A protein has these predicted regions:
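N-terminal leader/signal peptides at the extreme start of proteins
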Residues: 1-7
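Conserved functional hotspots that engage anionic ligands or polymers and/or phospholipid headgroups
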Residues: 10-13, 17, 27-31, 36-51, ...
Length: 148
């Protein structure tokens, strides 16, 4: 073969190499964006459940609770279409534990807790939140006291 017929072969190889490298970079970026999208969706579901639990907790503290329904052995719940709040007497004297539930797409609900003091003498009582009593974990010492 003559030298004239082989001109441009190395240029073609360089262009093909650049195209392959560009395709590999685009593929890697696509995978990275897919994982970032999944992470953003998970965060969105968590924040929705967290806000729902916080709203339920705030709503629950503002409710009147029947004195004869609350005990240390089990939760008594009130709910609306979107919110669910539960209360029980704490193992600590003079404390009512209020729980707000937020629905996750699968698995356990997200739960927030508030330590409160009961006010009132009739068949129901109002609750007043304890300063520093907001918790994202159940404060009871025994695990059975936190279970439904």
């Amino acid at each position: 073969m003559s030298a004239v017929g082989q001109r441009g072969g190395s240029t073609l190889a360089a262009v093909m190499l650049l195209l392959v490298m560009g395709l590999m970079l685009l593929n890697a970026q696509h995978r990275q964006l897919d994982s970032a999208l999944l992470l953003a969706a998970d965060q969105q579901r968590y924040l929705k459940a967290y806000n729902q639990a916080a709203s339920a907790l705030s709503w629950g503290v503002a409710q009147s609770w029947p004195r004869n329904r609350l005990g240390v052995n089990g939760w008594w719940c009130q709910q609306t279409e979107e919110l669910r709040a539960c209360a029980k007497l704490s193992a600590r004297a003079g404390i009512v534990l209020v729980r707000g539930d937020g629905a996750m797409s699968e698995g356990e609900p997200l739960r927030l807790y508030q330590l409160t003091k009961p006010d009132g003498t009739g068949g129901t009582f109002e609750l007043s939140a304890e300063v520093g009593g907001w918790l994202d974990f159940c404060p009871e010492k025994r695990e059975a006291d936190c279970a439904d």
